[in-house]
Amino acid sequence: MSFSFNFDVQLTTKCQQDEENQPQDGNEYSEVEPVPGITITTQDETVKAAVEHFPPATPHSLLNDAVSETITIGTLPPLNFLNESVFELTAYERDDEEMILSQTTAQCSDLISGVYEGGLKVWECTYDLLELLERDGERFAEKIVLDLGCGAGLLGILALKRGASQVHFQDYNSTVIEHVTLPNTLLNCLEEEEEEEEEEESKGKKPGKRQNNDEVIIEEEEEESMKSTEKTKSELKNKQKNEEVEDGRPHAKRQALDSSQHPKLSGCRFFSGDWTSFLSLILKEDPSLKYDIIFTSETIYNKAYYSALHNTLHRLLAPGGVIYLATKTHYFGVGGGLHLFEQFVEEKGVFDMEKLWVVEHGLQRHVVAMHFKTKDRF
Ligand SMILES: C[S@@+](CC[C@H](N)C(=O)[O-])C[C@H]1O[C@@H](n2cnc3c(N)ncnc32)[C@H](O)[C@@H]1O
């Protein structure tokens, strides 16, 4: 199986440097070091209200100064995403109302249960699932897909690139959606749009190059407002933020994405919040909504969330649909894992689970398909 990164910034993060000298200061969190390189901090479960996030009307603006890398797995289309090391080093520059960037850095933790659920980085089972999809050749054309607990969103992005008609991304943290999932989706959509434009131009179908229309608009808008109000960049940013309405829905201007210019992107929706409130938000809008494919990678590490997760899968999977679950056998320190989840699913009696792949190197990992038991399918 070919598996390559075409860009890799070799950086040592502060946490890596400090790892050996990490002080155990006995604060309110309990820390464990379950797997080399992964630190999990547990805290009482809290609930986070669901919010929908919208791409800005000028999508290129989210990619200013973005440093990206590309993963290529076999015959799958290349997937672009923000370089994690650069993201970590520049995290202090970002708006982060949830304060998860500072907390994860301060605690050198990849997971703070109920606060930050790990979506800032790509977890290894995502790569397993991508490999399996390459091997088995799942078809996405015209499908409605949910990337549940998406983090970087690579699984949903693959579905989008492979022709899914709608892809919904959900992550617990709004910071993850705003600063990672959305930019990653844009990186892929905008690149494809530009390639398509170039192809059309080379065939002589289009006279002029649209070439980053958005960037031109941004420049003009910014120049204009800088001239007239002499506001600094950060003042402008704050102004935009203050214009957001109270429930967190972005300013109307940000919602007005031109779907004719960005057809792929207009098939995407982005949500933050815990699974229970995500479920009520999305069903309130459309009680009949069902997904043909649900991806969920590295989301069964905490037994306390099984009920909300199972309920969400049960309510949202289409009859005849499939859930792809990618997981480690066991999550040391948090206690969850495949066997506990299997027991839970069996007790509920709603889904069959079919093991598609066991990855033996390193910590044992699995890719599992879940379908409704026959009686529930139709
Ligand atoms: C370890 S991360 C995995 C991220 C990504 N799927 C990957 O494989 O790289 C777990 C993800 O599950 C989601 N998650 C965990 N518990 C959740 C909960 N109670 N409600 C909503 N989302 C949750 C978070 O969004 C988080 O990004």
Name every feature range the model reports, one short phrase each.
Residues 1-378:
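S-adenosylmethionine-dependent methyltransferases
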